[in-house]
C-alpha cells in the first residue's frame, strides 16, 4: 500500500504532511514554505497560478484571483450573500449553485479547491519521489453533509481517493496526543482558523481519542476579523474623500492585504500604521490612505466576533457533561488563535493558560497524516471516535421532528426504527429527512425527501416500514426505508444541494434555546391533537362494530361527547382538547364496564378506545404516532 498523505485544506492556507516511519512530517512546497496560500489565479495569457505565486499578483489581478473558496463549498448561491459581497472576483448563479466566473468560464468551488489539492498532491509527490493517489482531508467539525461531500468531490477531481474525511479539531488532538502517556486526559481543542471556528472536547487515554462534544461557527474566522478592519478603513476613507473603495476590485484587494497585515502586527504590537499610497485617483489627482490603528480599536471593531466565540465553547462544555475544572489542557489551533484577545478570552473561560505547544498552522495536517498512518497500519494502537454535530431525524405526525440520531453521537453509527401507515389502504409513505435541534419539523433543515411505494393495501397500523439512518466515518448520511412485508427498499444519499449552511446551523441552536418555551407549547398542542385524532378514530370504529350492544342511555351521551371532542380537535387548543378527551374516555370506561358485566366474563369484552389508542395518547404523548404517514408499531422494534 502506498502512502496516504494528510491535507489540511484551509480557508486561508493549506498544509500537507505524511508519516515517515513512526513520525509525521510536514512537507515544504516548491517555494520552501510549509504552508501554501489557498489561492488560485488565472493570468491573461491563460496560465494558472496556485499558492504564493497567486498571492503575489493578487493586487494587480484582483478579479481573476480566487481566495477563501472554502466558504462556498457545498452551498447554494442564495446561501452566500455576504461572501459574494466581499469577494473581488465574480460569483454567479448557475442553476442555483454558486460558481466563480473567470473570463466567461465558470468554475465550481470544488474545481477551485481541487486545484489547491493538486498543488498539495504535487508537493507530496516531489518530496516522496513517488505517485500519491490517497489522502485524508480535514474539514471543520461543523461542516454539514453537503460541505463534506463537496470536499470529497474536490479530492476526486484532484486525482485523490479520499480515504477519510476527519474533523480539524480531532486531527489536532491526534497530533497533540500521539506521544502523550497520561491516561484519561480531557482536552479542549480551540480551533479558530481563517474561515471557521470549532471547539471540541475530547478524552485521550491509552491510544483512544474520543470526542465528547463539538460545537462551532462555520462563519467565524480570520477573514471576518480582516473584514472588520477593511470596513473600518473603507468607511474612514469615504468620510474623508467621499469615495467607497469597496467598489474598486484592486483597491479592495489592497485593503484586504493591508487589513491582514495590520491584524498580524497587532498580535505583537499595540498599534500599527496602515499606509496605502495611490489607493485611488480622482480628477484632483491621486489619493492616499494613512490610518493609525491601535489594538484597542481593533478589539472594539471586532467585539461582536469575540463575543460569538464564547457561546459555542460553553455549549460544548455543557454537552460534554464535564466541569471546566476537569479539563486538563486547552490546545490552540489555527492562525487566528495568535490574536491576544482570543487567548485572553480562552484563559478567562477555561481558567488556565492555553497550551501553545503545537504549531497552530501545521497541527491539523499532522493529525491528518497520523490518521493516514492508522489506515495504512503505520500507526497502531490508535482509535479515533468522532461525533456528528447536529441531530438527525424525520418529520412525524403533526409536523413534529422525531430524532433518530442525537447530536454528539459517536460515528460511524446506524439507527433503525419501525413505522406504519396512518390511513387504511395506504400504499406509499414519504420520508422527510431533517437536521437540527428544534422540536417542529418546519423549524429544521430539510436534507431530502423520498417515497417508498407499492405497500400492499392494509388497515392502518398493519404495514411495517423500517427507516434506517446510517452515518459513515466521514460524517456523510445515508437514509433508507424498507417495507418488511415485501422487502421493497428505497434509499437516499444526501446530496450537496439540500444541506445546511453555516448561519443556519448557528441559528438552529440559538433558536432552540430562545424559543424553548414556545416550542414546548407547540409540541404539546400537536401531541394532544394527535392523541385526540387517534381517540376519535378508535371511538368511531367501536361505535360501528358494537352497534346495538351499547346501551341506548350511554350511546347518545357518547356521541355528544365525541362531537365536542371533534370541535375541540378543530380548534387545535390543548386546553380544549384534554377535557373533551377525558369526557369521552370516562363514558367509554362506564360502557366497557357494563358490557363486561353483561357478558359475565371479565376481561373478555371489547377494549375501550382509550386502551386501543394507548395511555400515552390520552396523556398527550404520541411516541406511538410518528409521521404524517407513520406510527410506531412496537417499541420493541426500535434500535434494531
From Swiss-Prot:
What switches on expression, per the entry, is described as: By stress conditions e.g. heat shock.
Molecular function as annotated in GO = ATP binding; ATP-dependent protein folding chaperone; unfolded protein binding
The UniProt keyword set, sorted, is: ATP-binding, Chaperone, Nucleotide-binding, Phosphoprotein, Stress response
Q: Where is this region: Disordered?
A: 510-530, 598-640
Gene3D superfamilies, alphabetized:
1.20.1270.10, 3.30.420.40, Actin, Chain A, domain 4 (3.90.640.10), Substrate Binding Domain Of DNAk, Chain A, domain 1 (2.60.34.10)
What positions are modified (Phosphothreonine)? Answer: 196
Please state which protein family the record places this protein in. Answer: Belongs to the heat shock protein 70 family.
Function, as annotated, reads:
Acts as a chaperone.
Looking up PANTHER family in the UniProt record yields: HEAT SHOCK PROTEIN 70KDA
User: What is the protein name for this chain?
Assistant: Chaperone protein DnaK
Amino acid at each position: 500500500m502506498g502512502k496516504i498523505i494528510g491535507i489540511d485544506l484551509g480557508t486561508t492556507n493549506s498544509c500537507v504532511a505524511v508519516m515517515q516511519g513512526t513520525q509525521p512530517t510536514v512537507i515544504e512546497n516548491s517555494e520552501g514554505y510549509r504552508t501554501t496560500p489557498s489561492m488560485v489565479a488565472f493570468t491573461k495569457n491563460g496560465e494558472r497560478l496556485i499558492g504564493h505565486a497567486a498571492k503575489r499578483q493578487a493586487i494587480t489581478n484582483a478579479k481573476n484571483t480566487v481566495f477563501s473558496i472554502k466558504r462556498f463549498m457545498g452551498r447554494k448561491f442564495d446561501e452566500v450573500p455576504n461572501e459574494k459581497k466581499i469577494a473581488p472576483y465574480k460569483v454567479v448563479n448557475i442553476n442555483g449553485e454558486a460558481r466563480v466566473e473567470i473570463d466567461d468560464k465558470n468554475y465550481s468551488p470544488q474545481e477551485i479547491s481541487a486545484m489547491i489539492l493538486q498543488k498539495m498532491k504535487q508537493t507530496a509527490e516531489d518530496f516522496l519521489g513517488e505517485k500519491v493517489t490517497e489522502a485524508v482531508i480535514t474539514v471543520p467539525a461543523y461542516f454539514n453533509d453537503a460541505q463534506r461531500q463537496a470536499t470529497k468531490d474536490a479530492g476526486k477531481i484532484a486525482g485523490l481517493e479520499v480515504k477519510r474525511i476527519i474533523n480539524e479539531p480531532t486531527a489536532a488532538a491526534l497530533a497533540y496526543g500521539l506521544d502523550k502517556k497520561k491516561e484519561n486526559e480531557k482536552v479542549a481543542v480551540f480551533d479558530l482558523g481563517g474561515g471557521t471556528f470549532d471547539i471540541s472536547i475530547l478524552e485521550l487515554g491509552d491510544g483512544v481519542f474520543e470526542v465528547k462534544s463539538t460545537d462551532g461557527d462555520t462563519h467565524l474566522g480570520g477573514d471576518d476579523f480582516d473584514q472588520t478592519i477593511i470596513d473600518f478603513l473603507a468607511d474612514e476613507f469615504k468620510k474623508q474623500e467621499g469615495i467607497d473603495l469597496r467598489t474598486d476590485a484592486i483597491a479592495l484587494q489592497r485593503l484586504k492585504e493591508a487589513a491582514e497585515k495590520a491584524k498580524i502586527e497587532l498580535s505583537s504590537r499595540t498599534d500599527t500604521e496602515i499606509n496605502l499610497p495611490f489607493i485611488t485617483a480622482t480628477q484632483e489627482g491621486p489619493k492616499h490612505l494613512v490610518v493609525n490603528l491601535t489594538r484597542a480599536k481593533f478589539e472594539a471593531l471586532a467585539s461582536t466576533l469575540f463575543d460569538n466565540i464564547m457561546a459555542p465553547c460553553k455549549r460544548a462544555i455543557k454537552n460534554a457533561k464535564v466541569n471546566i475544572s476537569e479539563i486538563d489542557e486547552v490546545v490552540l489551533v489555527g492562525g487566528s488563535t495568535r490574536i491576544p484577545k482570543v487567548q485572553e478570552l480562552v484563559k478567562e473561560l477555561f481558567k488556565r493558560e492555553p497550551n501553545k505547544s503545537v504549531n497552530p498552522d501545521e497541527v491539523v495536517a499532522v493529525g491528518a497524516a497520523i490518521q493516514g498512518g492508522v489506515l495504512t497500519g503505520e500507526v497502531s494502537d490508535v482509535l479515533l471516535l468522532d461525533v456528528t454535530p447536529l441531530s438527525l431525524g424525520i418529520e412525524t405526525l403533526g409536523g413534529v421532528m422525531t430524532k433518530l440520531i442525537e447530536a454528539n453521537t459517536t460515528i460511524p453509527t446506524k439507527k433503525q426504527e419501525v413505522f406504519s401507515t396512518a390511513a387504511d389502504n395506504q400504499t406509499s409513505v414519504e420520508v422527510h429527512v431533517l437536521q437540527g435541534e428544534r422540536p417542529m419539523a418546519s423549524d429544521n433543515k430539510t436534507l431530502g425527501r423520498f417515497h417508498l411505494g407499492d405497500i400492499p393495501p392494509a388497515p392502518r397500523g398493519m404495514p411495517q416500514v423500517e427507516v434506517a439512518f446510517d452515518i459513515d466515518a466521514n460524517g456523510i448520511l445515508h437514509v433508507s426505508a424498507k417495507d418488511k412485508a415485501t422487502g421493497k427498499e428505497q434509499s437516499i444519499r444526501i446530496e450537496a444541494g439540500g444541506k445546511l449552511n453555516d448561519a443556519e446551523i448557528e441559528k438552529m441552536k440559538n433558536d432552540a434555546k430562545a424559543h424553548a418555551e414556545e416550542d414546548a407549547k407547540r409540541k404539546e398542542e400537536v401531541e394532544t391533537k394527535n392523541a385526540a385524532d387517534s381517540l376519535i378514530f378508535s371511538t368511531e370504529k367501536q361505535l360501528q362494530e358494537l352497534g346495538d350492544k351499547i346501551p341506548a342511555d350511554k350511546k347518545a351521551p357518547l356521541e355528544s361527547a365525541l362531537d365536542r371532542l371533534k370541535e375541540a380537535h378543530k380548534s387545535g387548543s390543548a386546553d380544549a382538547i384534554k377535557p373533551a378527551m377525558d369526557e369521552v374516555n370516562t363514558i367509554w370506561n362506564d360502557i366497557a364496564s357494563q358490557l363486561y358485566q353483561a357478558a359475565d366474563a371479565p376481561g373478555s369484552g371489547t377494549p375501550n378506545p382509550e386502551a386501543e389508542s394507548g395511555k400515552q395518547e390520552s396523556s398527550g404523548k404520541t411516541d406511538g404516532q410518528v409521521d404524517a404517514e407513520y406510527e410506531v408499531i412496537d417499541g420493541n422494534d426500535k434500535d434494531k
